[in-house]
Amino acid sequence: APGADCPSYLLEIRHVLDEEYAYPYSLDLLEQRFHVNKFRIAREFSQYFRESPIAYLTARRIQAAKNLLTSTNKQIREISQEIGYSSPTLFIRSFKKSEAITPQEYRRQYSRIK
């Protein structure tokens, strides 16, 4: 957990990534929005949260995907768009890298829909 010395702008960035994970954020966009140098954002975010802002965003998207995969019948294409991927292929690749199985396999194993 970040210490009390964590700069407030980093907590703000993390909150924005949590709430707006479907938006195609990049370091450039974060720099524009928060008026902090992107290299500083990358360095300090990683320092306090133990992963880069983009890795954090990806993890948040995967978490949302897992919820949608197990609680809805939405197609993979639909889910990938909803959580912010520009293509289902990128989503599937990202999901598999994170979870070691495809979204379809994850759904088969963990679906809460009977």
Where are these regions (language model features)?
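Basic/polar phosphate-binding segments, predominantly the helix-turn-helix DNA-binding elements
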Residues: 23-60, 80-105
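Intrinsically disordered, low-complexity basic tails/linkers immediately adjacent to helix-turn-helix/homeobox/MYB/SANT
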Residues: 112-114
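A short, Lys/Arg-enriched amphipathic alpha-helix from helix-turn-helix/homeodomain DNA-binding modules
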Residues: 1-25, 31-36, 56-74
